[in-house]
């Protein structure tokens, strides 16, 4: 199941991790940094930068950014380097990346049950992938900072009233009132606080044995009874237990290391005031580090080679993700990669593809071939969620006649399967998946082992923005991917 690694987190309550940046490196690093050609944490301000809030009070914004700059960082450069090493392994097929979490976190969602449920499903999915794929798995949570969302329109109109669009709790509130929708820079500090609390709680859970495979009550596989693959699913879980017992018999003691796992955080680097305020230099390490997260990514709407987001992220030392969709031009993508990674650094660039099951075959092969021909090392990850979003109108049930966004489980799985095949044919690796999920029993995506229908969506539809896989669907997806990887 790969070499277990201890989890490391940082929050204001665990400042000992900040000393990693002071003590773990005995001499300055001589590696070239990415902060070249006139880059600074604020150089993005000279570029056209999309999807930024229209802050009403510049003084309040300056005060909030100053507060952020004084607060302890959320992650360390040591952890970021560790992730980059693991991403480099994924690029060559030695490792698989599991990135998942909420579409958009909310401040109210920072509560123990919700956090524990998300951690639980990611841990269980990763164990299934390790067992089925026979590869080490890196777990990256899409949380502890995923509080901002891009919008297709700056404004929203209801019943003749027009207000700013809801851009996530980092910017404004969801309620349709002038007070709630006004962009409030004080929310930037609240976002940092919620992220720190989330990291602190996750660390305490893992330290306390939450990831311990010796506790069968953490595994809820009731849903497999609804699937024709039930026997295969149960056998996979049994094999994990058998492997653990074999290791313990072999060494004669309990394998304590499996109580702790490595875990990283990620979010879309959208609001650059927030990112800039937490970008710092650290002792004994070269370059600038975005210490708000281990792994930021650039969305499709902001992936402009000459735009502010690419300008900002080209100068930090973190690995950087880039969302790639049907509108992505191969030449523009190569320009983005060249700007973000002039040194062709393994583990630096992660391309997260989001086409939809209906479009992936028409778009992904030519992009894969273009990047492969360039010789640049990248990690390819499949996001099977965003390209498969659709709006349906249930014909019966609680939500009868009301349009609702959803995703079909069959389409999600089909996009992943096509991605595997396209990379196999091209001689490249699918290095991971990027999914929106929750560990709770929501009804937002249709299909899966229970056969959720459009008419059942209103029973438990709680997403703030886009539909997510529920616990059962997420674990079923992991098992089906593991089955595909084992072929």
Q: Each predicted region: which residue ranges?
A:
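Short, positively charged low-complexity motifs
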Residues: 3-8
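Long, contiguous, compositionally biased segments that the model treats as domain-scale units
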Residues: 9-172
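A residue-identity detector for tryptophan
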Residues: 18, 39, 44, 55, ...
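Glycine-rich, charged/polar anion/phosphate-binding loops
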Residues: 82-84, 306-309, 336, 365-367
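Active-site-facing alpha/beta catalytic cores
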Residues: 104-105, 110-356, 401-407, 415-416, ...
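Non-transmembrane, aqueous-exposed alpha-helical and coiled segments at domain scale
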Residues: 340-342, 348-379, 386-442
């Amino acid at each position: 199941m790969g070499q277990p690694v201890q989890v490391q987190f940082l929050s204001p309550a665990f400042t000992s991790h900040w000393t990693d940046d002071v003590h773990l490196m005995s001499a300055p690093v001589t590696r070239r940094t990415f902060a070249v050609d006139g880059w600074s944490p604020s150089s993005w301000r000279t570029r056209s930068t999309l999807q930024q809030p229209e802050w009403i009070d510049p003084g309040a914004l300056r005060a909030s950014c100053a507060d952020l700059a004084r607060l302890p960082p959320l992650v360390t450069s040591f952890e970021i380097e560790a992730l980059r090493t693991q991403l480099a392994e994924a690029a060559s097929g030695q490792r698989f990346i599991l990135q998942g979490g909420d579409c958009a976190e909310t401040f109210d969602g920072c509560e123990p049950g919700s956090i524990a449920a998300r951690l639980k499903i990611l841990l269980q999915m990763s164990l299934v992938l390790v067992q089925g794929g026979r590869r080490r798995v890196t777990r990256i949570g899409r949380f502890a900072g995923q509080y901002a969302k891009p919008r297709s329109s700056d404004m929203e109109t209801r019943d003749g009233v027009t207000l700013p669009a809801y851009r996530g709790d980092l910017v404004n509130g969801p309620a349709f009132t002038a007070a709630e929708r006004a962009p409030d820079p004080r929310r930037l500090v609240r976002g940092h606080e919620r992220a720190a609390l989330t990291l602190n709680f996750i660390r305490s859970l893992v330290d306390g044995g939450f990831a311990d495979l010796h506790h069968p009550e953490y595994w809820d596989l009731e849903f497999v009874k609804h699937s024709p693959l039930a026997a295969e699913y149960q056998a996979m879980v049994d094999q994990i237990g058998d492997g653990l017992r074999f290791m313990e018999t072999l060494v004669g003691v309990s394998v304590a290391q499996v109580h702790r796992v490595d875990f990283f955080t990620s979010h879309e680097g959208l609001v650059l005031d927030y990112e800039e305020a937490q970008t710092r230099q650290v002792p004994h390490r070269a370059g600038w580090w975005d210490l708000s997260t281990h792994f930021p990514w650039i969305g499709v709407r902001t992936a402009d080679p000459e735009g502010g987001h690419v300008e900002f992220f080209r100068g930090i030392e973190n690995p950087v993700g880039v969302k790639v969709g049907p509108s992505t031009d191969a030449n523009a993508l190569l320009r983005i990669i060249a700007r973000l990674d002039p040194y062709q650094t393994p583990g630096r660039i992660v391309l997260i593809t989001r086409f939809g099951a209906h479009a992936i075959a028409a778009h992904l092969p030519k992009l894969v071939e273009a990047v492969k021909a360039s010789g640049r090392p990248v990690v390819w990850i499949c996001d099977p969620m965003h390209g498969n979003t659709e709006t349906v109108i249930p014909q019966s049930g609680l939500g009868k006649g009301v349009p609702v966004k959803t995703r079909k489980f069959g389409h999600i799985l089909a996009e992943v399967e096509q991605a595997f095949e396209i990379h196999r044919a091209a001689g490249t690796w699918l290095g991971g998946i990027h999914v929106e999920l929750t560990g709770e029993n929501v009804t937002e995506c249709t299909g899966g082992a229970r056969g959720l229908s459009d008419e059942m969506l209103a029973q438990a539809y709680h997403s703030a923005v886009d539909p997510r896989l529920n616990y059962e669907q997420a674990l079923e997806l992991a098992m089906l991917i593991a089955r595909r990887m084992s072929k």
